[in-house]
Amino acid sequence: MSKLRNLNRQFISNLKTHETVTNAKRNLILSILKSTTTKREARNYLNKYQNQFDFSDITFNNGVPSNSLEKRDSQRELFINRFLNKQNPFTNIYDDETKLQKIPLRLALFKIKFQSISLENWKGMAETFKRLIHLGISPIIMLDYDHLPANTFRNNELYMLNQTNKIMNILGKPTEENDLKTIIMRSLFTKKTINDKDLAIDNLESVLIPLYQGVIPIIQPIVYNASTCMQEFIDSNDLLFSLCSSLLTTKNVLSIEKVVMIDPIGGIPSIERNQTSHVFINLSQEYSDIVSELYIGFIKPEYRIFHMNNLKAMNKTLTLVSDKTGNDETTGIITTPDIMSVNNDQLNPIIYNVLTDRSIISSSLPTSHNRTPELSTSILKKGVDVNILDALNYPKAFTLNNLVQDGSVNKSKLVDLIDDSFGKKLDTEKYFDRINDSLATVVIVGDYDGAAIITWETCSKTNEKIAYLDKFAIASVNQGLPGLADIIFKIILQSHPNELIWRSRKNNPVNKWYFERCCGTLSNPGSQWKIFYTGDIFNKKIDKLKKQGIPGGVNIHGKMHQYSDITENIPPSFL
């Protein structure tokens, strides 16, 4: 009878455990769906991170059941057992008994300038770390001690140990179940010679095994110099770069998802945004321009040095990751302790970027709009190359035929991109003949991953030429890709800041996106088109009365007639 009673208790306990686990899974998925703004974002996140969780009874890809060895816990056990048995943990890690799907650790590297971080902020940051782990991210923390003098190693070492222990106590004690588990790592790197700048990790497993056990490594900026047999401090940015370089030697077991700098001065400042941060930086295109901007003198020299160091370090690190992995999936984030401590998925830029792979607001939103918020966070990507073609920088007549003949534009790739983006066939010869002599600007991103064509269109009533966004195309595989549409549209607005118009069918779902980026819209009842307009001229006073002209103002009534005349008279481009 007692055995039966024990079995009954065990059965009830198992039911409760199953219910708890099921509820946890359901709550996780619901929180993901709530925090992402589109189905595509939710799907992309779940496809990328689903194997970081034990979703054994939930499938995301056509109902295919997940192999038990494909789960992170199984991989942890295999990895650790091999290491303890003095085997190479990285050899055929996915080939025991069955071919296993690769399940890399999803890493986020945090470089934290911690001196002025308050206790309250640390507590909030600890909650952010917990949320990141809950979402499948494995954090690594590097504390920035660059403010210490370089000639007093012993005193610095004691200070570092004391500060790290304080931070570990704030983040949580390993004995407490719900707290974060952390471990201090020092002398992780070795310098072979006195002048050697290339640092190496002799025992990478010492970093990876804690990560597989759910423990956060806190790495001290101390290196062992093999030639002098002494320990030395290293610059925190050099530490970040060397850590990335070492981790990327084992790309089959990990991926570096985020590189995060937590700094009280925040993201990279922008003149355009009233010295608040650049929202998104496409480093391949904007790096040199932003460096030049920082030297204009709109910020104090002492702050400029810090921002320059952050920008250079992020560019160097993201370039390394991009070169070694062959992709642009790693995101850089520079933000403040205050912002990292925000415990709201849609307001915390780090959490939001994990879920959506983009910034909280769009970088192409007009800075002049009151509804566009000002931020202290910059999102950075190595990004894509951008080619901007216009009459000012072209030695011959700026026609499409000339651009094609001298190889500046690949006609077949451009046509393929437009066909793919719009889902219908371009009437190629007719379209190119129409725009050949009226070309204003051509923007080509990457290997025709996206493009824009802007033309000069003439109003039949006033003969005034106005810039018209004729084609805005993004390859279907890249549609929804974070940042690409923003990169192109931002260039479009910068190329024609004074006045720009475009049209879109009234039932186009993209119209909401367009509406957020324009100064106004026009829609004639009998037309299939919605007309959008923007430009600096609309920041001036608007003269709404035909008979009373305001000097320097805009006759909005006349402009609407011009825009309507132009857009209604442009012939269809597709077959």
From Swiss-Prot:
Its EC number is 2.3.1.1. Residues 1-35 form a transit peptide. One of its GO terms (biological process) is ornithine biosynthetic process. The keyword Transferase applies. InterPro entries: GlcNAc_Synth_fun, Vertebrate-like_GNAT_dom. Keywords: Acyltransferase, Amino-acid biosynthesis, Mitochondrion, Transferase, Transit peptide. GO terms for cellular component: mitochondrial matrix. Gene3D superfamilies: 3.40.630.30. It catalyses: L-glutamate + acetyl-CoA = N-acetyl-L-glutamate + CoA + H(+). It comes from the Eukaryota. It is found in: Mitochondrion. It is an enzyme of class 2 (transferase). Residues 398-557 form the N-acetyltransferase domain. The keyword rRNA processing does not apply. Its main location: mitochondrion. N-acetylglutamate synthase involved in arginine biosynthesis. Belongs to the acetyltransferase family. This is Amino-acid acetyltransferase, mitochondrial. It comes from Debaryomyces hansenii (strain ATCC 36239 / CBS 767 / BCRC 21394 / JCM 1990 / NBRC 0083 / IGC 2968) (Yeast). The gene is ARG2.
